[in-house]
């Protein structure tokens, strides 16, 4: 290693030591009982609730995936995705947060999402609990793999090591930390990591813009690429059979402008629908100490989200201007943040900025693994297999499950040509369509019953797979993001099945009215 690489490594090691320290600090408290381990004893303040919710939501996708999209094909895809996410974030905090916090207490003090849905409908056979836990295991394992891909790309790009080896090192660190501290440690570190992420974004976009000659120069140079700065048109890189962009006279080659229809806009904005079913965000709503503090949390979260999304998109544009031919495949384009940091900053500062990517990855992957493990340990092991299991047994089963899920995620992440944005988009659609409609109808429609809930979950998840793997291949209007049709289909199934089957019991309707009136 040269001296620059050593300095970057030192900065990142310091950061990781601080994160491990947080895990050690909270480990004793996390081992008290399962509510402390999985939900932090419902003790989160407004700042930690807001920042940890958004940091765990965004992941390395924010610093690598989203800038990579803007770098590869320009403003349209990245902007409409970011816009949809900002709107979805606001609506989730406005509509869902307060009522879910209240309802989760009313529903037998539920501490996981599957447990909430099961208790909400007072089911005895625990079918909803089993199904929702199973879907969480599937989609979060896929989600966690995207974080491991981020680790592999980050470390192999910085230190020149083999991708698989670097990915395994990153996964091992994430796993160790998550097993150690539980939800409270995860939320506390996510708060710190949210700060690191937004500082890293601010530093890179500022340095990059100055290096390019200022904002005016960035925009003028970007306009030279056909469709690059259009909202209703998209730049089209000309690629060879291997998917590598062609270069002529030192400049990357672009074809004509790809049309961007209103349907495509709606498809990209549909990312915002995913928030209503995103467990890592919904659990923060359940974990805040007082529902009255959610309004303040919403404001904090929105400021963070709008700034971070806007800056991430602009980093991709700045990167294309400064390093137009540095990354010639869609997968490699996701390294533009790393390129800007290592080429524009002193090594020690670049190391701390790189810690921003590590922060984003850790803040998400620990959430994904912890929630998936809790779904199995709390809702399948204790909920169905061994109902008299002690808290200590539940926590040990959770930790073993963490290890198994991480190993599966590692297998998925072995392909170094994986595109982070594409992995995240599929898992995001899975959660959004499986749990989003059910969450909204559970909170706001009294007539929703157990049969409708099951139909909504199964139909939403099935449609995501069907649309992604089969229908989207037809092209044209069918090439839209799978979340949109799956979300709509799930809503229809909930309504139709609920109306065709027996109304909820008197007790369930009384619970609903008590939550709506605030008399919990």
Predicted regions and their residues:
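Membrane-embedded helix-loop-helix hairpins and adjacent transmembrane boundary segments
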Residues: 1-520
């Amino acid at each position: 290693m040269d001296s620059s690489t050593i300095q970057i490594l030192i900065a990142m090691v310091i950061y990781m030591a601080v994160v491990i320290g947080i895990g050690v600090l909270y480990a004793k408290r996390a081992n008290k009982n399962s509510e402390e381990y999985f939900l932090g004893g419902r003790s989160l303040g407004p700042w930690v609730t807001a920042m940890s919710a958004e940091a765990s939501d965004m992941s390395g996708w924010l610093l690598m995936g989203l800038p990579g999209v803007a770098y590869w094909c320009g403003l349209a895809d990245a902007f409409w995705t970011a816009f949809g996410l900002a709107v979805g974030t606001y609506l989730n905090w406005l509509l869902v947060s307060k009522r879910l916090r209240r309802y989760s207490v009313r529903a037998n003090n539920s501490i996981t999402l599957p447990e909430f849905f099961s208790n909400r409908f007072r089911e005895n056979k625990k079918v909803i609990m089993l199904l929702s836990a199973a879907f969480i295991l599937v989609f979060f394992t896929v989600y966690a793999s995207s974080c491991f891909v981020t680790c592999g790309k980050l470390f192999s790009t910085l230190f020149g090591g083999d991708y698989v080896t670097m990915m395994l090192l990153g996964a091992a660190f994430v796993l160790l930390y998550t097993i150690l501290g539980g939800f409270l440690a995860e939320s506390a570190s996510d708060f710190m990591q949210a700060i690191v992420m937004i500082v890293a974004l601010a530093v890179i976009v500022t340095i990059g813009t100055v290096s390019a000659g200022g904002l005016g120069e960035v925009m003028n140079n970007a306009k030279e690429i056909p469709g690059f700065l259009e909202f209703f048109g998209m730049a089209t890189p000309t690629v060879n059979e291997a998917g590598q962009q062609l270069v002529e006279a030192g400049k990357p080659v672009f074809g004509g402008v790809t049309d961007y229809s209103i349907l495509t806009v709606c498809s990209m904005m549909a990312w915002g629908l995913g928030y209503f079913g995103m467990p890592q965000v919904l659990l923060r709503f359940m974990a805040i100490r007082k529902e009255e503090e959610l309004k303040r949390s919403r404001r904090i979260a929105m400021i963070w989200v709008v700034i971070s999304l806007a800056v991430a998109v602009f980093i991709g544009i700045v990167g294309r201007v400064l390093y137009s031919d540095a990354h010639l495949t869609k997968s490699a384009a996701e390294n533009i943040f790393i390129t800007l940091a290592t080429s524009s900053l002193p090594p020690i500062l670049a190391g701390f900025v790189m810690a921003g990517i590590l922060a984003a990855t850790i803040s998400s992957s620990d959430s994904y693994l912890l929630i998936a493990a809790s779904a199995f340990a709390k809702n399948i092991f204790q909920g169905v297999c061994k109902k008299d299991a002690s808290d200590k047994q539940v926590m040990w089963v959770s930790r073993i499950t963490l290890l198994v899920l991480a190993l599966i995620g590692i297998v998925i992440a072995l392909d170094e040509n994986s595109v982070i944005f594409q992995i995240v988009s599929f898992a995001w659609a899975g959660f959004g369509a499986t749990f989003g409609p059910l969450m909204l109808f559970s909170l706001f429609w009294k007539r929703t019953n157990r049969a409708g809930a099951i139909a909504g979950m199964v139909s939403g998840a099935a449609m995501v797979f069907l649309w992604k793997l089969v229908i989207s291949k037809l092209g044209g209007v069918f090439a839209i993001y799978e979340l949109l049709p799956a979300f709509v289909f799930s809503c229809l199934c909930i309504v139709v099945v609920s109306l065709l089957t027996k109304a909820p019991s008197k007790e369930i309707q009384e619970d609903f009215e008590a939550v709506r009136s605030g008399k919990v």
